Amino acid sequence: MNYQIKRNTEETQLNISLANNGTQSHINTGVGFLDHMLTLFTFHSGLTLSIEATGDTYVDDHHITEDIGIVIGQLLLELIKTQQSFTRYGCSYVPMDEALARTVVDISGRPYFSFNSKLSAQKVGTFDTELVEEFFRALIINARLTVHIDLLRGGNTHHEIEAIFKSFARALKISLAQNEDGRIPSSKGVIE
């Protein structure tokens, strides 16, 4: 199934679709480093994203990065509500040379985000690295996930962020996988 949101504000104009079919993604955010990270995310999560985005990047990349996180989170929530049969929990460790990241995901319906990741530099190229946390916070809160992201080892900032995006993607893939009995994975019988 394909989920789509068009979101237009005074700061950004977004047209984003999400599918859980593993087909080729098309990502054009206007922010090269973010395009790269989202491409890695789609490859390692098995999700398909189509993103056409423009915005006030002449100010900085904050609005477009955060707004894309918001919309991807909203789309993930729709996918989760439709799917209903999923493993729920996922954990992934990903090394990227000297960097090592761990992400733990719970599709709980209770939004919580812990980001224990001290990045080595404030910028990768022109991209402000503090936006990594902003992107994930926006996505996770809007998808109603519980997520813990920990950067366990660091070094090169590009490697640190790449390990974070890949570990999140792989943990999400595990948590979205169909569960064996087809039931909602909660003793309450519901995840909202």
From Swiss-Prot:
GO MF terms, alphabetically ordered: imidazoleglycerol-phosphate dehydratase activity
Enzyme Commission (EC) number: 4.2.1.19
GO CC annotations, alphabetized: cytoplasm
Pathway: Amino-acid biosynthesis; L-histidine biosynthesis; L-histidine from 5-phospho-alpha-D-ribose 1-diphosphate: step 6/9
Assigned keywords, A-Z: Amino-acid biosynthesis, Cytoplasm, Histidine biosynthesis, Lyase
CDD domains per record: IGPD
Source organism superkingdom: Bacteria
A single GO BP: L-histidine biosynthetic process
Location in the cell: Cytoplasm
Gene3D superfamilies to which the protein is assigned, alphabetical: Imidazole glycerol phosphate dehydratase, domain 1
UniProt-listed HAMAP family: HisB (MF_00076)
Protein name: Imidazoleglycerol-phosphate dehydratase
Organism: Staphylococcus epidermidis (strain ATCC 35984 / DSM 28319 / BCRC 17069 / CCUG 31568 / BM 3577 / RP62A)
Phylogenetic classification of the source organism: Bacteria, Bacillati, Bacillota, Bacilli, Bacillales
Gene for this chain: hisB
